[in-house]
Regions:
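Structured beta-strand/loop patches that form or line metal/cofactor-binding pockets in enzymes
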Residues: 4-58
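Active-site mouth loops of central-metabolism enzymes
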Residues: 140-155, 204-210
Length: 248
């Protein structure tokens, strides 16, 4: 086939890891992060094209994550996949690894490989990836994420003003401090600093309960909060329904 002639079969996969300590630890409502582990998964086609996917895994279970990537590598190289067969490869591997559970480490490894395959396919065709996705938009909205709970007020405001200066239309701030008054005060400070036109989102990283979530929403809704991300555990469907029911 024409595709076969341009040598798109996956010939090899390589895994690299780097670990770095942060100059200053950061924290959200559920995590304290002092160092990060960073993985690169590289795919090589029979035509010699390289594609890379990146995984930021912070410092969690590096051996398990690397093991999941090595298991996936063995699976892929024992078969003949073209770099554009992203969906088929994912479906095959999910069927293969279903016994151990699809979410979690398996999905992390698959996602990193998926990015590497798209990269290799785009490089094979000599096109940027966004063209392969259809190119239907000239612009997409993006937001600046950060606002870590560990930030001082000065650091928080410096960050959101920098996002505004760079042209971001929205910022996302961490909430879920032990002292809710601090969350409320920080959100007020952000709104004062960036003015009325930028969107503000807040993210508790699943670190709050229903009463504290409802209380926070009521105290800051006049600030025009665009969304509230992960107030409670992502499997607490009843909790989310209650939060929705108790707030406007």
């Amino acid at each position: 086939s024409e595709m076969g002639e341009i040598k798109t079969l996956i010939r090899d996969m390589r895994i690299y890891q780097a670990t770095s300590s942060l100059s200053r630890p950061i924290a959200d409502a559920t995590h304290d992060i002092s160092k990060i582990a960073f993985y690169v998964l590289e795919v090589e086609t029979e035509g010699g094209i390289l594609g890379q996917g990146y995984l930021l895994s912070f410092h969690y279970s590096p051996n398990a994550i690397e093991g999941a990537m090595k298991d996936l590598k063995r699976f892929v190289l024992e078969r003949k996949y073209h770099v554009y067969e992203t969906l088929q490869l994912q479906q095959d591997y999910e069927a293969e690894s279903e016994y151990f559970g699809i979410p979690g480490l398996q999905r992390w490894a698959l996602a990193t490989l998926n990015v590497a395959l798209w990269d290799a396919w785009a490089r094979t065709l000599g096109q940027p990836i966004y063209r392969l996705f259809g190119c239907s938009r000239k612009k997409i909205p993006v937001y600046g994420s950060g606002g870590w709970i560990s930030y001082t007020d000065e650091e928080l405001l410096e960050e959101v003003k920098e996002y505004q200066k760079r042209g971001f239309q929205a910022v996302k701030i961490k909430v879920g401090s032990p002292d809710q008054e601090r969350d409320v005060r920080r959100l007020h400070l952000v709104r004062e600093a960036i003015g009325p036109n930028m969107k503000i989102m807040m993210d508790a990283n699943q670190g709050m309960d229903v009463p504290s979530s409802v209380s926070l929403i009521e105290q800051v809704k006049h600030l025009g909060i665009h969304w509230f991300e992960e107030p409670v555990s992502n499997t607490d469907f009843e909790g989310y329904a209650l939060i929705h029911q108790k707030t406007s």
